Amino acid sequence: MSPATPVPPDSILESPFEEMALVRGGWLWRQSSILRRWKRNWFALWLDGTLGYYHDETAQDEEDRVVIHFNVRDIKVGQECQDVQPPEGRSRDGLLTVNLREGSRLHLCAETRDDAIAWKTALMEANSTPAPAGATVPPRSRRVCPKVRCTTLSWNPCKVERRIWVRVYSPYQDYYEVVPPNAHEATYVRSYYGPPYAGPGVTHVIVREDPCYSSGAPLAMGMLAGAATGAALGSLMWSPCWF
């Protein structure tokens, strides 16, 4: 007895999807939750109790996936969907409203009423039937999501270096000499040609200041000294009144 010839999978189902994992698939209209616009998507109900919708029947580009298993409160069909309008040119008989336990709703529209009833039956079975062991379902990582690369740059103010170009002309020696601005700064002298002075033989000075050095302390000391001086002068002005 010759072995049975394997049945080729449905042409719609492509690798890595397996026919055994798909419960029901077909085209449905879906209403967006924000703009309330209708869009036609390919829907696939998988054995793990999830409902995914895609750009086309190849099920390669997944827009999103909704958990159906133990998450459906009720499903309305046709004229029962009073709070939603069908897509332009479609009949109200094909409407489906899936009320989820988490509070959200999924508004769909099938081609015919019979198709809508078939989808309702499949969704209700997926809601109450546990997924069989070994069922192969496409991973959710195949969703179509914007690829955003986040780059984090660490910044430390103590690592910032500010360069100041300083030159002082000495009339006695007839050349430019370097004078350090403050004692807490380190001065490095380098002789080369370049900006900001392009004259020949100009000596440039690069001053590396400590950006963590706070100028608030000298300012506070100056204000304190000024206040003490003012108080002393005030007491001297009123001193003749004591005699």
Curated annotation (Swiss-Prot):
Its main location: membrane. It is found in: Membrane; Cytoplasm. The keyword Membrane applies. The keyword Membrane applies. Highly expressed in retina and brain. In retina, abundantly expressed in photoreceptors. Isoform 4 is the predominant isoform expressed in mature olfactory receptor neurons and vestibular and cochlear hair cells. Also expressed in cells with possible sensory function, including peripheral retinal ganglion cells, cochlear interdental cells, and neurons of the circumventricular organ (at protein level). Pfam families: PH (PF00169). GO terms for cellular component: cytoplasm; membrane; photoreceptor outer segment. InterPro entries: PH-like_dom_sf, PH_domain, PLEKHB1/2. GO terms for molecular function: protein homodimerization activity. Disruption phenotype: Mice appear normal at birth with no obvious behavioral or growth abnormalities nor overt sensory deficits. At 6 months and 1 year of age, mice display normal retinal histology and normal response in electroretinograms. Keywords: Cytoplasm, Developmental protein, Membrane. Residues 21-128 form the PH domain. Binds transducins. Homodimer. Interacts (via PH domain) with MYO1C. Interacts (via PH domain) with MYO7A. This is Pleckstrin homology domain-containing family B member 1. It comes from Mus musculus (Mouse).
